[in-house]
């Protein structure tokens, strides 16, 4: 399967909140996830953590995608429902090996999250 198809399958499963199907897109060994607020080196633990996001996910829209070899980049708008709807821009970088995602990196402005959990450095 082409890298873009693997990552698109993962995102579609995430949109449907089908975390079992999303997990099937991730490598069993050597998986890595990095974001401004979390990091995981175990796909099962990562998917368990995504349940919370799924509970508040309202919409996930792809604005742009491109592929370079085994690397796939998506620019996404993610809308969550927390005290009303909030939409944030997120860049997801994925590396595919074989038919599985071995690395995900999410790049986004985490200042709202840090304010929500009471990070005093953000005023």
List PLM regions with ranges:
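C-terminal and inter-domain tail/linker signature
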Residues: 1-123
């Amino acid at each position: 399967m082409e890298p873009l198809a693997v990552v698109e399958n993962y995102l579609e499963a995430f949109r449907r909140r089908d975390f079992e199907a999303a997990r099937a897109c991730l490598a069993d060994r050597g998986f890595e996830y990095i974001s401004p607020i979390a990091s995981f080196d175990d796909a099962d633990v990562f998917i368990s953590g995504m349940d919370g996001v799924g509970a508040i996910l309202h919409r996930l829209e792809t604005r742009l995608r491109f592929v370079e070899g085994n690397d796939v980049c998506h620019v996404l708008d993610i809308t969550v429902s927390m005290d009303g709807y909030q939409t944030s821009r997120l860049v997801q970088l994925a590396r595919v090996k074989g038919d599985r995602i071995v690395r995900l990196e999410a790049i986004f402005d985490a200042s709202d999250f840090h304010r929500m959990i009471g990070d005093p450095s953000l005023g």
